[in-house]
From Swiss-Prot:
Membrane topology: Single-pass membrane protein
Role of this protein: GDP-Man:Man(3)GlcNAc(2)-PP-Dol alpha-1,2-mannosyltransferase that operates in the biosynthetic pathway of dolichol-linked oligosaccharides, the glycan precursors employed in protein asparagine (N)-glycosylation. The assembly of dolichol-linked oligosaccharides begins on the cytosolic side of the endoplasmic reticulum membrane and finishes in its lumen. The sequential addition of sugars to dolichol pyrophosphate produces dolichol-linked oligosaccharides containing fourteen sugars, including two GlcNAcs, nine mannoses and three glucoses.
Lineage: Eukaryota, Metazoa, Ecdysozoa, Nematoda, Chromadorea
Protein name: GDP-Man:Man(3)GlcNAc(2)-PP-Dol alpha-1,2-mannosyltransferase
Enzyme superclass (EC): transferase
Residue spans crossing the bilayer: 16-36
Length: 470
């Protein structure tokens, strides 16, 4: 071993030797000071993008609503980065988007001004690490503003967990998706090209090794963060499998997201009338405009299915009801519109961005088929809602839809799964060709299968877990 390597190891050991007591010296006063500031009977949700209007926000508002009813003697807070929205505006959006009414007298918003730090656009390289560290900074801002008795990370900022554990708060994690998963490690190790593993890296031995090392080190950090939670909850089987593996804990419970099944069951579908009277096959995609949602595949499917449907005597339309959170999402919409122009499908494409709840209900009532294309969707609230609303679901054959939702019920088909563009096109044609009776059978058993995803089930399981820390 060279003198340089020995010197480097020696310096590293010395650095650690001095750092450990320094960290301990900082932690002790931090914990003591936090104890003086901690407010009893307070529950705070760390959800910097609480006004985004996605599935994660449905969980947030439903959780607060059920806790307001079950534990009215506690006070509820939300750490929010939506500094441009008032409390009234945020609660109004929760009601309009999800139909969820909250008691405004028992909820306060604590505004965080450093939210921009966690946005991926700032970090072109080592994005996960820098976002995690930025999340820690944001958590420290939250800590500075208030230390609650119970801290709930409902959005997935792992380093917020040890920060509030050290402050003496009871810590709860509700994980929608793992920051890093076994699948991500496998993709890099097998050198597959995906949206988060570029061809440049996949084709290079050195870069693949470097990224795999980085992922493994980050997985260790994620493991440490996960150990800080007193209670761990996940949204489905896929997420549970990865979290139990990476966090090395077996006490992580599945609490399915609250799907407003009853409300969607009451939607009166007019899809068959549209099919019969106007010869229109209406497709619907519901989901935020994010890269992993793979809207580009939906456009390609629309392009490829258009001609064979026309030969069968049908028109086809695709409505994309997507949530746009920021400028990055708006840019993706522009790119998708340009792609639609190239594919000559703009006339068949309908955009409904940041759609209110009432308008979403209308779109669901008109849709014959709901199309979902995200690979390894962690759960899939939109999939459940689509099935409840009597649309025929065509989902990606992976993640939560495959493991939890689109599974035969009492031996009967409840929907369809596909992976490739060709499979999606083939399945759409099959659904149209199979006839009204078969489609109605699929709808009937799909709707029967959804009781386990209702709001009542969510409230029961959520309160059971939360009681452990109250």
């Amino acid at each position: 071993m060279s003198d340089t390597v020995i010197s480097l190891i020696s310096h590293s050991i010395t650095t650690v030797f001095y750092l450990v007591p320094l960290i301990i010296a900082l932690i002790i006063p931090f914990s003591l000071y936090s104890g003086f500031r901690r407010k009893s009977k307070t529950v705070a949700f760390f959800h910097p993008y609480c006004n985004a209007g996605g599935g994660g926000e449905r969980v947030l508002w439903a959780a607060i609503r059920t806790m307001q009813k079950k534990f009215p003697d506690h006070k509820y807070f939300v750490y929010s980065g939506d500094t441009d929205a008032t409390k009234e505006q945020i609660l109004l959006k929760a009601r309009q988007r999800f139909g969820i009414e909250l008691d405004p007298s028992n909820i306060q918003f604590i505004y965080l001004h450093w939210r921009t730090l966690v946005e991926a656009r700032h970090y072109k390289h080592c994005t996960m690490l820098f976002q995690a560290l930025a999340g820690l900074i944001l958590a420290l801002e939250a800590w500075f503003r208030m230390v609650p008795a119970v801290f709930i990370d409902s959005m997935g900022y792992p380093l917020s967990l040890p920060a509030f554990r050290l402050s003496g708060s009871k810590v709860v994690a509700y994980v929608h998706y793992p920051t890093i998963s076994c699948d991500m490690l496998d993709v890099v190790e097998s050198r597959q090209e995906t949206f988060n593993n570029s061809s440049t890296i996949a084709q290079s031995n050195v870069l693949s090794w470097g990224k795999l090392t980085y992922y493994r080190l980050f997985a260790c950090l994620y493991w440490l963060a996960g150990k800080a939670a007193h209670v761990g909850m996940v949204n489905g089987s896929w997420t549970q499998r990865h979290i139990t593996s990476i966090w090395s804990r077996r006490d992580v419970s599945i609490v399915y997201p609250p799907c407003d099944v009853e409300a969607f069951l009451n939607i009166e579908s007019v899809a068959e009338s549209l099919l019969e009277d106007t010869k229109t096959v209406r497709l619907l995609s519901v989901g935020q405009i994010r890269p992993e949602k793979n809207h580009k595949l939906q456009l390609e499917v629309l392009h490829d299915v258009k001609e064979p449907l026309e030969k069968m005597g049908y028109n086809v339309e695709l409505c994309i009801a997507g949530g746009c959170r920021n400028e990055e999402d708006q840019e993706r919409v522009k790119m998708l519109k340009n792609e639609a122009e190239k594919l000559d499908i703009s006339e068949q494409l309908i955009w409904q961005l940041n759609v209110p709840y009432e308008d979403l209900v209308v779109e669901l009532s008109k849709a014959l088929i709901s199309i979902h294309t995200m690979h390894n969707e962690h759960f899939g609230i939109s999939v459940v809602e689509a099935m409840a609303a009597s649309t025929i679901i065509l989902s990606n054959d992976s993640g939560g839809p495959r493991m939890d939702i689109v599974k035969d019920y009492e031996g009967h088909c409840v929907g369809y799964l596909s992976i490739t563009k060709e499979e999606y096109v083939e399945t759409i044609l099959k659904i149209v060709e199979e006839g009204l009776k078969k489609r109605n059978d699929t709808r009937k058993y799909a709707r029967k299968s959804l009781t386990r995803f209702g709001e009542a089930a969510f409230e029961t399981h959520w309160n059971k877990e939360i009681e452990k820390v109250l």
